[in-house]
């Protein structure tokens, strides 16, 4: 069994304490066992739909889907894949907002298992620590690689960064298109959903909140 990093353990514990962890049930299956089980179920689904798995275009589809689920689009369910995070002392005494905009985000709606596609915007005001900029992108992508609802995803990213940076002064905004709305049901191809989660001074200080929201429009 792969041991988890200190950062992964801290973040998981924080999410569990706040009731923000993705609904999970522990099982003893390793990655290979999960892939084999999913492949068998996917094969049964395709056969139920009447698809010919003897066709060379479809024969490997159950295997591809199983591998994609475990190794890629749902890899964020496994904290062993939590990114290696570099947090360093704020020696330059930076005390103004740092913002990373337009972080590409692809997730999966947990209600219909179809795509959520959008952009995340992250800001924080350093206290004692700063984080490598690319690590923010990786943390966003880690939590996106799960079955998700956008509201929880936004809050998970917020709490993870608050935990790692040792400050409440973090703000997150996500704007995304949901294919459960675009490709089925109401079939609305133009709407999108925006969620925001604010902590610390971004929540309590109107000027700081306004600075963050203005930064989203630039």
UniProtKB/Swiss-Prot annotation:
GO terms for MF: GTP binding; GTP cyclohydrolase I activity; zinc ion binding
Residues annotated as binding Zn(2+): 109, 112, 180
Pathway: Cofactor biosynthesis; 7,8-dihydroneopterin triphosphate biosynthesis; 7,8-dihydroneopterin triphosphate from GTP: step 1/1
Any one annotated GO CC term: cytoplasm
Catalysed reactions, semicolon-separated: GTP + H2O = 7,8-dihydroneopterin 3'-triphosphate + formate + H(+)
Catalytic activity, EC: 3.5.4.16
Listed GO biological process terms: one-carbon metabolic process; tetrahydrobiopterin biosynthetic process; tetrahydrofolate biosynthetic process
Keyword Ribonucleoprotein: no
Keywords: GTP-binding, Hydrolase, Metal-binding, Nucleotide-binding, One-carbon metabolism, Zinc
Organism superkingdom: Bacteria
Assigned protein family: Belongs to the GTP cyclohydrolase I family.
Quaternary state and interactors: Toroid-shaped homodecamer, composed of two pentamers of five dimers.
Protein name according to UniProt: GTP cyclohydrolase 1
